[in-house]
Amino acid sequence: MTARWVVDEVAAERDLRITWQPISLLFKNEMTEADEPYPRYLKTHKMLRVMESVRAAVGDAPVGDLYWEYGRRVHHDQDKDFDVADALTAVGLDAVHAAAFEDEAWDAPIRERMAVGIELAGEDIGTPIIGFHDRNGDRRAFFGPVITRVPSPDDSLDMWDSLMTLMNIDGFWELKRTRTERPDFGERP
């Protein structure tokens, strides 16, 4: 949801350049096969391997297209067992990258890219992480925002500008409140 908010409502209005980075909750939460959510986290982790294969072969730009296709299938179609090769071809990418799904060699680049976000945002966070350059040009990142729907265009920009203001204040660290509703993904894009 946060990705949809930033890409659809904020990026063009605030001249943002989006580079998709992986975060594996399997690695972040140090999951083992004994953990109940392990199969779900393993599946999404393997999807990240495919994304890193794509990035290595053709650069950052198509990674976003694949991310959206994954999201359409998982969140809108409720298909958590889709064929990754089908998702690749749906966005014009070579299905050969599907082999990365089972290839543990892609775990190293996932860990390396995750480490950058975690170093900037902190260890006690999850996903999403938004990284940016502050008003002094220093790299910063924060966890969130966690939202259940994409705000209106005006509210989206207000929220972004408010977050950027807060994140530029030294000594500011955290806001939180209990979530009381489930995400509303809207129509399938």
PLM regions and their residue ranges:
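Structural alpha/beta surface segment adjacent to cysteine/selenocysteine redox centers
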Residues: 1-84, 162-163, 174, 186
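C-terminal cap of thioredoxin/glutaredoxin-like
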Residues: 6-11, 81-189
